[in-house]
């Protein structure tokens, strides 16, 4: 579920590969299918992390023009609900097309450092998708934005929480394990144990060997956060 994710946590639990050729020929569903009721989205976003992280976080919600602040926080953390727009930019290639899936809801809370360096990337991905750009066009735009400094440099690892009990990461997946997202620039899977695709974690889930690499680390299922 970008990343989404992100949302590619689904890859780690055996989600069948999409037919990329078929998906890429489709237009995006209407934006209305991606939107949620505002209050419900705020509650879902806060469920991404424990209260100590999310209670004083800034909450953003998706609109037809991108994410906007719904509630201003004061601790530097930012929580929102990622959609399929947060798919990997490069790899695994077969999951780039989950941008077309409006059912994905992936609550995430970016800690303050991640909000500064990783969140702008996900917001740009979302805006490009809302503008109708294809996965290839999104990748080209992000690569150019990073190279020219329009996106913040990723020079250190940062983290985000995805602990919600109410995740929906893809058809047949729904709520996966609560987990941490490590934004680990240029990491390869061999650097986190080399665990085979679909086996035990941690693993690189998105965009290995690039500035946008994501490593997924699960936590105890008992830590899953429910909406209040």
Question: What do the PLM-derived regions correspond to, one by one?
Answer:
Residues 1-8:
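Bacterial N-terminal signal peptides that target proteins for export
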Residues 14-19:
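N-terminal signal peptide c-region/cleavage motif recognized by signal peptidases
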Residues 24-228:
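Primary mode marks residue(s) on the alpha4-beta5-alpha5 output face of response regulator receiver
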